[in-house]
């Protein structure tokens, strides 16, 4: 029987941190970060990374594990996170995954072996160029749907790496990715997933407040420091919301007001995409984070069936 992990997800600024820390303290959990930006060292303010005080309240994993110059893949996250989970459980503790990166959760719950037999760098580069063009992700996903509808249905168009890999395998072998031998794999652990939500107007107001606090805490200075340390502006990490909007300001290409406007707008759009993604996931408990019994609902859901 698979060991069960708890997962707390939801859009940015929905209150995941406070609830996860309470769960961790009460139920002897160690937190595994499920955020694609908090993995990067030196990117603290713009990623809303757990503070030193918060990290002192519970053991945190998968934070500060990569340099901003690295291209950290979903597959690498899956491998490292599963290793963390196994270690946590081997020591008799609970693993609580916390974050809003849907691709990471999908990789853990529905792992898909990418296959190493067929690979061609020129084909991959060609597909990557298409993906980088306007409407490119949609175009690639449509191509995949035409030749391999089963895999296309499984993969979101934003899962560009896996869409490209599926197309690459098809072009090299002439067989749909879904029909390749031993392609699909079973999840290593069982995941009990809860997602936070709240009225959109309140969520957007919280996003505005969070960004204002980030700016007060020195977000602009953090971006400048990263650039001066040699992190290229086109590094994958610097394309994250909070950094890509502030880079033009740090380089004198735009005003602070323009940068902040773009940052707040993009963050609202991102929160909306996060909610849309999670609604596609199966077996998710939705909890209004503003309800007085939000914690009690989470606790009851996670511990159901356990001996008291």
Residue ranges and their predicted role:
Residues 1-308:
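Phosphate/pyrophosphate-binding catalytic cores of soluble transferases and nucleic-acid-acting enzymes
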């Amino acid at each position: 029987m698979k060991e069960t992990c708890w997962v707390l997800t939801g859009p940015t600024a929905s209150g995941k941190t406070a609830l996860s820390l309470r769960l961790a303290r009460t139920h002897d959990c160690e937190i595994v970060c499920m955020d694609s930006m908090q993995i990067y060292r030196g990117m603290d303010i713009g990623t809303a990374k757990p503070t030193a005080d918060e990290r002192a309240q519970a053991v945190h994993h998968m934070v500060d594990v990569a340099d901003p110059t690295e291209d950290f893949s979903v597959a690498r996250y899956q491998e490292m996170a599963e290793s963390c989970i196994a270690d946590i459980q081997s020591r008799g503790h609970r693993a609580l995954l916390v974050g809003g990166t849907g691709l990471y959760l999908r990789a853990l719950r529905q792992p898909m072996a990418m296959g190493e037999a067929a690979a061609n760098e020129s084909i991959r580069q060609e597909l990557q160029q298409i993906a980088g063009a306007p409407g490119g992700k949609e175009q690639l996903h449509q191509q995949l749907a035409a030749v391999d509808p089963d895999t296309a249905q499984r993969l979101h168009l934003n899962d560009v790496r896996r869409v490209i890999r599926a197309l690459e395998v098809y072009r090299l072998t002439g067989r749909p990715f879904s029909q390749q031998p031993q392609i699909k794999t079973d999840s290593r652990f069982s995941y009990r997933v809860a997602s936070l939500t709240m009225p959109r107007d309140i969520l957007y107001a919280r996003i505005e407040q969070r960004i204002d606090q980030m700016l007060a805490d020195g977000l602009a200075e953090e971006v400048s420091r990263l650039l001066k340390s040699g992190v290229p502006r086109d590094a994958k990490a610097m394309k994250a919301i909070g950094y890509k909007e502030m880079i033009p300001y740090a380089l004198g290409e735009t005003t602070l007001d323009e940068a902040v406007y773009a940052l707040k707008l993009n963050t609202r759009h991102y929160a909306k995409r996060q909610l849309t993604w999670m609604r596609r996931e199966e077996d998710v408990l939705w909890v209004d984070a503003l309800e007085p019994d939000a914690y009690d609902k989470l606790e009851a859901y996670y511990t159901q069936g356990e001996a008291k």
